[in-house]
Amino acid sequence: MPSPFPGMDPYLEDDALWPAFHHQLVMCLYQILLPGLVDRYRARVYQRHYDAGDHTEHHEDYVEIRQRSDGRLVTLLDVVSPANKTAPAGREAYLATRRTAGAAGVNLVEIDLVLQGQPMLEYSRDGLPEWDYAVTVTRATQPKRYEIYTATLQKRLPRFRLPLAPDDRDTVVDLQTAFTRCYDQADFAGRIDYRREPPVSPKEGARRRLDEVLRVNKLGGMRGQTSAGYVDPPHQAIALAAYYLWLAKGRPHGRDREHWLRALEQLRGPAGER
């Protein structure tokens, strides 16, 4: 079952889900990247380790793209985690990876799908539309210039251009395709209880957009939902029918039957809502 969100799913920021999501997303990005790389490059998934001060060892995957001929690092693709944006040690670990690559004249691609915490990169948002999620590309040939691809909670995740060596054309990566594959392969639909509130408390603009998506999809604590977040009248009807069968100690009859039929019809809803 797909995510009820058109792009990134903020329920994945849950501490219990993010590590698996981060790993799976990076692996899906890696898989999608491979066909777009010309023969002169190879991609590998690496991992940084650190303790964010909560006595928990954090492991964060990222992708390095290197030239086959000499092994020189060309592009670093990294995914921001909640710990990077909320814990000093996590922030420093992420920025250290970025500084090392930047000093070596490497293209940098940052994927930030985290609502909470402070942005990793500081730049003016004047004249730019509001966004909740961003992919920021920094080319080695223009290290002071950012290419920013954005999305909100109400939009699909963007496609972005991933730079390689200056004499090679960019490869285009569809982040939404990677996310959808990640969500399906890891079966997050079966692991998220959309009846509860999301694990993040975003700022005003993002909160408004989040509330709108929850309202449209009838999520976030609405009564009578399945764990996947959708109203499921047939299953409710079965449960209610079983209840009345138990009350009647057999086949519903008389007033019990009338109550059962009325409740069943209410659960089914008017024609066209089934």
PLM-predicted stretches and their roles:
Residues M1-T226:
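Gly/Pro/Ser/Thr-rich low-complexity, intrinsically disordered segments predominantly at protein N-termini
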Residues G224-R274:
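Intrinsically disordered, low-complexity, basic-enriched segments
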